[in-house]
Amino acid sequence: MIDLIRLGDTTDHGGSVITASQTMRYAGRRVAREGDLVECLLHPEVQPNIIIEGDRRITDRGIPVARQGHRAKCGCSLISSLV
């Protein structure tokens, strides 16, 4: 299953992914990685709110790519628009 997180994908806290790879794309959208930024509507005080998990089997220049269910620093889960 392709469940990559990409720029603009949402979270279970109502936010979205706001930064992503400059080099890796899937289906026309930039792929999010560990360390990329997330906006969280429930926890705006968490700054920087970065993606803290990634799949080490899929990397972009050595940085693990985020997938469905991975989390950001505020605790929200990422939701892939591909599933």
Residue spans of the language-model regions?
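Intrinsically disordered, low-complexity proline/glycine-rich segments
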Residues: 1-83
